[in-house]
Amino acid sequence: MDSTQIKQGNLRYLIHLLLASLAGLSIAIIVTHAPVFWRLRSSKNTLDPPGFREGLNMLIPEIHFDAEVQDPLYGEALAALKAASAMKHGGKHSKAVKLFQQAVSLAPHHPEILLQYGEFLEQHDVVQAEHLYNRALTANPLDSRALANRQRALPKVKQLDQEMLDKIDEKRDKLFSIPAGSLPMKRAIKEAYFQHIYHSNAIEGNTMTLSMTRAIVETKMAVPGKSILEHNEVLGLDEALKYVNSTLIQKSESITIDDIIEIHRRVLGHAHPLEAGRYRSTQVFVSDHVPPAPEDLEKQMNAFNDWLLSKDPEILHPIEFAALSHYKLVYIHPFTDGNGRTARLLMNAILMRAGFPPVIIRFQDRHDYYEYLNQANHGDIRPFIRFVARCTERTIDAYLASTTIYPLGHERTRELTDAHDEKDPNR
């Protein structure tokens, strides 16, 4: 996945120079395996605490969009907005939603379109409305209407986010109370291990099935009809997961960039040994994102390391800290390949150190994952954090279902079966 995106970015480089904009970031979706040892730490449920914005903005330049620049779709977007407003006042809300969405897709940085759509949604979806107000402020930081709307919506959004994190913490505590040595928990951990490797590699284009992945990890035997590279990707992620589980989650000190390099060394150790654990020496392009130049990598990574060791993580909820760490690393993109996988391992190491199981991002969720990262690139990291939170909750639910006996046909049983289904109609 990483290599494909780099090639696509190279083809679009001239377009990037002409547009002179920094837009969507697409990265590989990487996961880790369930921990053998979880250490429960106290967590503070916060959203936008002191230092949160500073932590987010470190290493990431401010991005503003000139709403006055009209492209060929500008007029069409305003026409859709006008039609949406008419449908809204006529009580035809379903049609209004489609027209608002069309207007936003045609002019995604136009403040008036974002504001009107947000005001339309606020009563029924205040989280999405506040996100639209935030996007309007990114396009025009001095927009008084956008400021007023966001100030009105933000307290409600903070309360909802707080409730979401509290709910996940309660489920984490319930899971933590189950003996790690119990047979159901051991089975759940083992199955999750294979699930993580399978989904991680599938998202990057690896065609190994779940059963093939399990066979390679358990026997180290080759699977007929599959490339050496695909085998090596499975072996590399297997070693990286073992390193995270046996070393990082039991480490008393904070995670540093040295640990990140060690993760990467194992991720690419079989597939690309010459690049494993080394910063890139060439410029790369990831979709529409242009990472820092090679000569700036050491400075950027040192700044990232300073942030990891600072007091900022202590005021963040572990899910926020983990998601931010992941985002910062993929933004820098310090390696030629394997950045997404390494960032996901870093994120899950942070979660496990706080008593959470590692997040499972399913192959079929990749589109949403890319979209939330794209939104982060445009100034709002919170949709990405919420996505990570939902994935964390779903993972905990799967563990609880695996370790609880339910009657055949019970809703929980069906959920667990769906979570473990390796088939995907898109593959």
UniProtKB/Swiss-Prot annotation:
UniProt GO molecular function: AMPylase activity; ATP binding; hydrolase activity
Paired cysteines (S-S): none
Binding residue positions for ATP: 204, 286-289, 337-344, 369-370, 377
Active site: H333
Means of activity regulation: The side chain of Glu-204 determines which of the two opposing activities (AMPylase or de-AMPylase) will take place. In response to endoplasmic reticulum stress, mediates de-AMPylase activity. Adenylyltransferase activity is inhibited by the inhibitory helix present at the N-terminus: Glu-204 binds ATP and competes with ATP-binding at Arg-344, thereby preventing adenylyltransferase activity. In unstressed cells, disengagement of Glu-204 promotes adenylyltransferase activity.
A cellular-component GO term for this protein: membrane
PROSITE patterns registered for this protein in UniProt: FIDO, TPR, TPR_REGION
Keywords, sorted A to Z: ATP-binding, Hydrolase, Membrane, Nucleotide-binding, Nucleotidyltransferase, Repeat, TPR repeat, Transferase, Transmembrane, Transmembrane helix
Catalytic activity as recorded in UniProt: L-tyrosyl-[protein] + ATP = O-(5'-adenylyl)-L-tyrosyl-[protein] + diphosphate; L-threonyl-[protein] + ATP = 3-O-(5'-adenylyl)-L-threonyl-[protein] + diphosphate; 3-O-(5'-adenylyl)-L-threonyl-[protein] + H2O = L-threonyl-[protein] + AMP + H(+)
Superkingdom of origin: Eukaryota
Pfam families noted in UniProt: Fic, TPR_19
TPR-type repeats, residues: 77-110, 111-143
Bilayer topology annotation: Single-pass membrane protein
Task of the protein: Protein that can both mediate the addition of adenosine 5'-monophosphate (AMP) to specific residues of target proteins (AMPylation), and the removal of the same modification from target proteins (de-AMPylation), depending on the context. The side chain of Glu-204 determines which of the two opposing activities (AMPylase or de-AMPylase) will take place. Acts as a key regulator of the unfolded protein response (UPR) by mediating AMPylation or de-AMPylation of Hsc70-3/BiP. In unstressed cells, acts as an adenylyltransferase by mediating AMPylation of Hsc70-3/BiP, thereby inactivating it.
Family: Belongs to the fic family.
Subunit structure: Homodimer.
Protein name: Protein adenylyltransferase Fic
Species assigned in the record: Nematostella vectensis (Starlet sea anemone)
